[in-house]
Amino acid sequence: MLKGLTSKADARLKPALPGFTNVYRYWDARFAKVAVKLQPGECYVTKNDEMLVTVLGSCIAACIRDPVAGVGGMNHFMLPEQAAGHEITRNSLSNPELCYGNWAMEHLINSIIKCGGMRNRLEIKLFGGGRVLANMVRMDIGQRNIEFVESFLANDELPVIAKDLGGNYPRKILYFAATGQAKMKKMGIASDTNLVKQEKAYLDSLATKPSAGDVELF
């Protein structure tokens, strides 16, 4: 039984698709749905009526679905591209490759297509890329992530139907894969000290490792 699930809710729970069983799921009483919590470097695709949840600073989350095939998902990446010699190796990350936008975007889109989706039907929403630390003026990871994801989708001729990118605030995102509805909450930086620590770790990692539709506020 997933954390927080009642026996009644557990009886309605459908299994996660193969390849996505390790992502943390729990019962959200407010929305009366199974929720899926994505951390940096994670991706989740589903055919179920689930709510995908993540918190973003400079990271980007792409929310993508095919409304005809009834499949959708979300990724959460930290940096634009993995070049030779660049690597994120912190043990807390479930898949270091998916911390990079070039891997994360391909993985999400290809996983949706494998589940019956088609590229010409994809609905795409983008969030994140904020500047949440003062010293990011010198190394604005969020802006680099924005430039990457917009260029990636433009090169593949995949239109974005809604986005909320940039700014100087973190975001909490709720994405309802079955309907494509997205809810976004702007957060104060002080409200999530773990996020601030995470952002500082991004900068430290870069400094010490060698090179290599509509949005509803709630």
UniProtKB/Swiss-Prot annotation:
Belongs to the CheD family. Its EC number is 3.5.1.44. The keyword Hydrolase applies. CDD domains: CheD (cd16352). The keyword Membrane does not apply. GO terms for biological process: chemotaxis. HAMAP family: CheD. It holds the Pfam family CheD. The lineage of its organism: Bacteria, Pseudomonadati, Pseudomonadota, Gammaproteobacteria, Cellvibrionales. One of its GO terms (molecular function) is protein-glutamine glutaminase activity. It catalyses: L-glutaminyl-[protein] + H2O = L-glutamyl-[protein] + NH4(+). SUPFAM superfamilies: CNF1/YfiH-like putative cysteine hydrolases. Probably deamidates glutamine residues to glutamate on methyl-accepting chemotaxis receptors (MCPs), playing an important role in chemotaxis. This is Probable chemoreceptor glutamine deamidase CheD. Keywords: Chemotaxis, Hydrolase. It is an enzyme of class 3 (hydrolase). Gene3D superfamilies: 3.30.1330.200. InterPro entries: CheD-like_sf (IPR038592), Chemorcpt_Glu_NH3ase_CheD (IPR005659), Cytotoxic_necrot_fac-like_cat (IPR011324).
